[in-house]
Regions:
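Structural microenvironment flanking redox-active thiols in thiol-disulfide oxidoreductases
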Residues: 190-254
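Short nucleic-acid-contacting surface segments enriched for D/E, G, S/T with interspersed K/R
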Residues: 84-97
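Short aromatic-glycine-enriched beta-strand elements
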Residues: 58-67
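N-terminal "domain-start" segment that seeds a small globular fold
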Residues: 92, 115, 119-165, 193
Length: 307
């Protein structure tokens, strides 16, 4: 994948700070160039549903018994290229929905893979509806200040399991927002590096009541499998580090309540960077805007909160 040049952007949120940050774009030379590339691409894409037969982690493939794809292919069992995270998440007999991609070289791949789980989907959907209502009721006061409680939500982690704040009750939580395709070294990549550094330093300092959460800014692309691949490629210890994704509406409401700006302008994702620390009672106790914060500073706050 080819990544982008930087474009400066002046952003002001409905929160008490003003920031200047670059935009992140998964493309090479602007909207016109990307549109032309898509027009010239010979890739074909189709929605797909089916049942996983088995995964091959070494070859990074899934064998799927898929349903008929109208106008393209009858129902059959086929092997598809996928991410290593998707293979790791795969369970034999699991129903999935995905996007089938016929690449220019003829290879067939699956992207945007989601498990079809009515129970989990209902749980996430219900929580997302409640979050939407809460954000709407709060109106102009939707932004949560330091001292307010963490909003309730439910999202999927990098393994596809449903995660809500209840899972972390009695623990401190450090939260930030990233997306896996972000090419700007001083933004998401630095934010992730700082989070993993904080995780390591917290462990060394004996802070054991801490969980780390990175919520995607790009839920359409960042499926559980993509997030798991992202974590694995960086050697991140996920025993207390969750990467979350879910409905776009829920992500937008969380961004609003946390005072984070993220908006696609064409293919460009313009966003700010913020990191928050939540105490064991669910209260926001610290916030750092931008990506130049110190892991040692957060660990110090954690140690103080633990005592």
């Amino acid at each position: 994948m080819v990544y982008s040049r930087l474009r400066p952007l002046l952003l002001m949120a409905s929160v008490p700070f003003l920031v200047v940050l670059p935009a992140c774009k998964p493309g090479s030379a602007g909207d016109k160039a990307e549109a032309a590339a898509k027009a010239d691409s010979k890739e074909k894409r189709y929605p797909l549903t089916g049942e996983i037969i088995k995964g091959d982690l070494e070859r990074s493939t899934l064998l799927v018994k898929h349903d008929e794809i109208p106008g393209y292919m009858m129902a059959m069992t086929m092997e598809f290229a996928v991410t290593v995270g998707d293979v790791a998440n795969a369970q034999s007999g699991q129903r999935i929905r995905a996007e089938l991609v016929e690449r220019e070289d003829g290879e067939l791949a699956l992207e945007k893979i989601w498990a079809i789980d009515t129970t989990a989907d209902a749980q996430v959907g219900s929580a997302s509806g409640a979050l939407r209502q809460d954000t709407s009721i709060r109106g102009r006061r939707a932004y949560r200040e330091v001292g307010e409680n963490l909003p309730d939500f439910a999202l999927y982690d990098q393994t596809g399991k449903v995660v809500s704040p209840a899972k972390f009750r009695g623990k401190q939580v450090m939260i930030n927002f990233i997306f896996t395709r972000c090419p700007v070294a001083t933004m998401c990549p630095l934010a992730t590096a700082n989070m993993t550094s904080t995780q390591r330093k917290a462990k060394e300092a004996g802070v054991n009541d801490i969980e780390f959460i990175s919520i995607t800014l790009d839920p359409e692309f960042d499926t559980p499998g993509v997030l798991r691949t992202y974590a694995q490629q960086r050697g991140i210890d996920t025993t207390n580090f969750s990467f979350l994704t879910g409905p776009e509406s829920a992500i937008k409401d969380l961004l609003t309540q946390f005072g984070v700006i993220a908006e696609f302008k064409g293919s460009i994702l313009q966003h700010t960077v913020s990191t928050l620390l939540i105490d064991t009672t669910g209260k926001i106790i610290w916030r750092a805007d931008g990506s130049q914060w110190s892991p040692d500073e957060f660990v110090g706050k954690m140690k103080k909160s633990s005592t």
